[in-house]
């Protein structure tokens, strides 16, 4: 038998062996022998890892986790989900949409209040950017945001949308967020904060999309521009000014709309940062912002983010930290 034929036969035998083992594991789970099946999955995981069969280990743990989730065995399922991450961390697996979708699927099935879920998402985001201090791949953030939106966890969904490139999805979530939790006089506040924070994250494209989509879809906003709400007019002018990059326009705009900007003490802090990023305004002389506002702004900016270049999220796929 030639070498290629021998390799093909070996591969077929291996697949057949894996399928038989998985069949036994599934039967154990369906009989209710959860502990036995869980331990067997772990044994196979370490066996595959010792043989550097990373893809096989990852797929087996993923399918096993789904099986345990389908039988409401949260602890076993969460453990196998963590092993999926362990494979990714220890192998040279590239970040691909299919893997990100698998991670998001596991996240969606975990108990919403479990500590394992928080640990899982933290490790998954860290892996998705190569283990650096950056806060995760935009695609993974988008998938997490969509799951949290379905769970009506709007604040967490908003956080992940801000680190994605999905301005349209973010806007639609914000409309629902306002309808569920907001007051009528806050219709403009929901989108203004999102636009300003997207701009602070150097994501001009998503800032524009979230504004246009929100103002088009929101049932309480009359068609514009111009808008009835002064703050919405300010945001519209600001996005135009960012495209133009003229400091005088930005300065006059901020002065003219001060009454609207005083509605939230963070707005001027965000605008200081936007002035630096898009209009060449030098940073303040003080080494850092102080007090509560400083803590909030620093959490938005990240502690050591490089300011060089004004890039959109599609070009800069490592958004800065936002707590």
From Swiss-Prot:
Pfam families: GET4 (PF04190). Gene3D superfamilies: Tetratricopeptide repeat domain. Residues 304-315 have a biased composition (Acidic residues). Its main location: cytoplasm. Residues 303-323 are annotated as: Disordered. Keywords: Cytoplasm, Transport. It is found in: Cytoplasm, Cytosol. Belongs to the GET4 family. As part of a cytosolic protein quality control complex, the bag6/bat3 complex, maintains misfolded and hydrophobic patches-containing proteins in a soluble state and participates in their proper delivery to the endoplasmic reticulum or alternatively can promote their sorting to the proteasome where they undergo degradation. The bag6/bat3 complex is involved in the post-translational delivery of tail-anchored/type II transmembrane proteins to the endoplasmic reticulum membrane. This is Golgi to ER traffic protein 4 homolog. It comes from Oryzias latipes.
């Amino acid at each position: 038998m030639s070498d290629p034929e021998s390799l093909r036969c070996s591969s077929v035998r291996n697949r057949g062996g894996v399928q038989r083992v998985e069949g036994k594991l599934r039967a154990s789970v369906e009989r209710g022998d959860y502990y036995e099946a869980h331990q067997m999955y772990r044994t196979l995981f370490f066996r595959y890892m010792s043989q550097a069969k990373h893809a096989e280990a990852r797929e087996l743990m993923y399918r096993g986790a789904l099986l345990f989730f389908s039988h409401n065995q949260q602890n076993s399922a969460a453990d196998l989900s963590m092993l999926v991450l362990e494979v990714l961390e220890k192998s040279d697996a590239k970040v691909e949409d299919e893997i990100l979708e698998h991670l998001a699927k596991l996240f969606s099935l975990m108990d919403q209040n479990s500590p394992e879920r928080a640990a899982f998402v933290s490790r998954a985001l860290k892996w998705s950017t190569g283990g650096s201090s950056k806060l995760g791949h935009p695609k993974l953030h988008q998938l997490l945001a969509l799951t949290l939106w379905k769970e009506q966890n709007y604040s967490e969904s908003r956080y992940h949308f801000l680190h994605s490139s999905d301005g349209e999805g973010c806007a639609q979530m914000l409309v629902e967020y306002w309808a569920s939790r907001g007051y009528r006089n806050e219709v403009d506040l929901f989108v203004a904060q999102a636009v300003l924070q997207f701009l602070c994250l150097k994501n001009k494209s998503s800032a524009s999309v979230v504004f246009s989509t929100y103002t088009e879809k929101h049932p309480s906003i009359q068609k514009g521009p111009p808008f009835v709400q002064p703050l919405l007019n300010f945001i519209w002018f600001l996005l135009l000014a960012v495209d133009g990059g003229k400091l005088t326009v930005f300065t006059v705009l901020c002065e003219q709309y001060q009454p609207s900007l005083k509605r939230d003490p963070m707005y001027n802090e965000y605008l200081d940062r936007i002035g630096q990023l898009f209009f060449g305004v030098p940073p303040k002389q003080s080494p850092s912002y102080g007090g509560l506002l400083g803590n909030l702004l620093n959490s938005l900016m990240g502690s050591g983010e490089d300011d060089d270049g004004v890039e959109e999220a599609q070009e800069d796929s490592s958004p800065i930290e936002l707590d």
